[in-house]
Amino acid sequence: MLARTVLRSVPFRGVARQSLNKTSTRASSSAAGAESASSPFHLTLTASAATAVALGSAAYLYGQEAFAMTPAEEGLHPTAYPWEHAKWNKTFDHQALRRGFQVYREVCASCHSLTRVPWRSFVGVMHTVDEMKAMAEENEYDTEPNDQGEIEKRPGKLSDYIPAPYKNEEAARAANGGALPPDLSLIVKGRHGGCNYIFSLLTGYPDEPPAGATVGAGMNFNPYFPGTAIAMGRVLFDGVVEYEDGTPATTSQMAKDVVEFLNWAAEPEMDDRKKMGVKAITLLTGLFAISVWVKRYKWSPIKTRKIVYSPPVSRR
Amino acid sequence: MRILKSHPLLKIVNSYMIDSPQPANISYLWNFGSLLALCLGIQIVTGVTLAMHYTPSVLEAFNSVEHIMRDVNNGWLVRYLHANTASAFFFLVYLHIGRGLYYGSYKSPRTLTWAIGTVILIVMMATAFLGYVLPYGQMSLWGATVITNLMSAIPWIGQDIVEFIWGGFSVNNATLNRFFALHFLLPFVLAALALMHLIAMHDTVGSGNPLGISGNYDRLPFAPYFIFKDLVTIFIFFIVLSIFVFFMPNALGDSENYVMANPMQTPPAIVPEWYLLPFYAILRSIPNKLLGVIAMFSAILALMVMPITDLSKLRGVQFRPLSKVAFYIFVANFLVLMQIGAKHVETPFIELGQISTVLYFAHFFVIVPVVSLIENSLVELATKK
């Protein structure tokens, strides 16, 4: 469009005729100039077509999604929930974290490990030192080899990590019909959809698979899981956990709490990060404002200068 | 004489950053250079810090990165800065190149600066790719597998070269170790190249300007005018970077890379980071593997022909409306390619990718020379009465 308008303002035929005559002097740098320069209208057309193709394909591409897999293989896209802790100016709800940890301990921990989270990291976040020490001591850990080279057992310390439910991957697979329950330390960061996906998965088990859906033996139907057949069954039912703070333990409440807890497990630095972010943005905005002021202060004489041309005057 | 002008080292600083006379009319689009230098600085400082805690071993790499994220004081800040500044680096370098294309910065006498700049882009991409492998998540491993396998397209010796790069028969511990060593080395090569880039410009005619004419009619010293002008964009850059680092640090990353590398399981889609997508799209648009690899590398090297194929007598496109249209089509096409690079290989994206690839190369080899010749003619006709 623009190209056409631009070219329309130029007398076409005159251009074409004259440019043919002037080719030798004008396009000394290239021999290709003669035939191309003689037909600017074709080029306008090409340019317009190219613009149309580029803009059209851009609109087309941004407008739709491609799926290499069928919707079932892809898994149902989770609903976007308004997570309070995901907002830029919000921290984790630490009571929810505490409830979520209770759900993890009483429900998830029988199959899923949380190997990157040590007992110490709970202190000051959702539990007191004494609570965590007691919790750590409930577990046994191997000692260093003693003088005889024997490895003994000792109660856990704050510096220990949460023990895994199975000795190794093979044991985990053997106990779960060949499926490996993934470690949950990074699950929120390591899955497309993050919190929304985990929440949808936990609460998305239908009572029965929909008509037409086939699920293999020992598998369960969940529309949010890629492939829809998941080895894990529905684990959250109303009242399966009794919250110590009296919150009614509905399925969605537990799912929400445990997702927030797993988000903390994946990003324990989030509260600090956002707090530091607010400080950084505040500070930098101030510095930016000052820098704009200094720049204008330094440049104002340049921007407001007047350049005068005094023609030479003959003095005779 | 002032020590700034007589001291053998300080006088270099003086001639580059203090007294250095710059054209008075350069716009804010001339600020990307200082921002890119800042990016390189941030990357080297954060990178060296990360290297103090990182373990380049297939068994421990992922764990050591998580150790940095969880246990090292402010380790998350250092790593998120490193990861997001890499994206910012490419975002700015594309703007910097776009500025060069728009204002004809590649034209003589700045061809050497432009050529070094193209080499810098290639080294940057290599460095970014090597760095992305280091956390050794799923996308690290499989990205490394895909990209190193490109070399197998070389006739006769391709497979041998790939195994030489791997140091084995697949991406393994030796690969990770050498990638770490090279990722540590290349930023310093980049710094040297950036210095060459600067010297090549400084010792010819210095910065161009938006009018495309000589800058000698009106110049201002670098200090204080351009130091304070650069500072404005530096703070804007820090604000935007902070928004990413502190509030959405993983927005530009792939969640697949928070899953530990598993050679037994291929992720559903192997996608490079956003800044490599246009070239990945060009690679995938060519049905032949060898030609695809050649096309991908040529796509970057095509920048080098700009000084030759732009036959215009004017510097830059600001007074050449046809070229302006061609420039914006090129930019739109680049963004289209970036989208296509992230799509699965299937109709219609294959065909669109091929059209975009043709348009990409046509810009450098056909559109620019033809349009510049037409404009030469028009200018000549208009000025000759």
Swiss-Prot record, chain B:
Keywords, in A-Z order: Electron transport, Heme, Iron, Membrane, Metal-binding, Mitochondrion, Mitochondrion inner membrane, Respiratory chain, Transmembrane, Transmembrane helix, Transport, Ubiquinone
Annotated Pfam families: Cytochrom_B_C, Cytochrome_B
InterPro entries with a match to the protein in the record: Cyt_b/b6_C (IPR005798), Cyt_b/b6_C_sf (IPR036150), Cyt_b/b6_N (IPR005797), Cytb/b6-like_sf (IPR027387), Cytochrome_b (IPR030689), Cytochrome_b_C_euk/bac (IPR048260), Cytochrome_b_N_euk/bac (IPR048259), Di-haem_cyt_TM (IPR016174)
Cofactor annotation comment: Binds 2 heme b groups non-covalently.
Gene Ontology BP, a term: mitochondrial electron transport, ubiquinol to cytochrome c
Binding site for a ubiquinone: 202
GO CC list: mitochondrial inner membrane; respiratory chain complex III
Chain residues that bind heme b b566: 96, 197
One GO MF term: metal ion binding
Cofactor field: heme b
Cellular location(s): Mitochondrion inner membrane
Entry's transmembrane regions: 32-52, 76-98, 113-133, 179-199, 226-246, 290-310, 322-342, 349-369
Positions annotated to bind heme b b562: 82, 183
Membrane topology note: Multi-pass membrane protein
Main location: mitochondrion
Domain of life: Eukaryota
Described purpose of this protein according to its UniProt entry: Component of the ubiquinol-cytochrome c reductase complex (complex III or cytochrome b-c1 complex) that is part of the mitochondrial respiratory chain. The b-c1 complex mediates electron transfer from ubiquinol to cytochrome c. Contributes to the generation of a proton gradient across the mitochondrial membrane that is then used for ATP synthesis.
Quaternary assembly: Fungal cytochrome b-c1 complex contains 10 subunits; 3 respiratory subunits, 2 core proteins and 5 low-molecular weight proteins. Cytochrome b-c1 complex is a homodimer.
Other remarks in the entry: Heme 1 (or BL or b562) is low-potential and absorbs at about 562 nm, and heme 2 (or BH or b566) is high-potential and absorbs at about 566 nm.
PANTHER family found in the cross-reference section: CYTOCHROME B
Family: Belongs to the cytochrome b family.
Protein name per UniProt: Cytochrome b
Organism: Aspergillus tubingensis
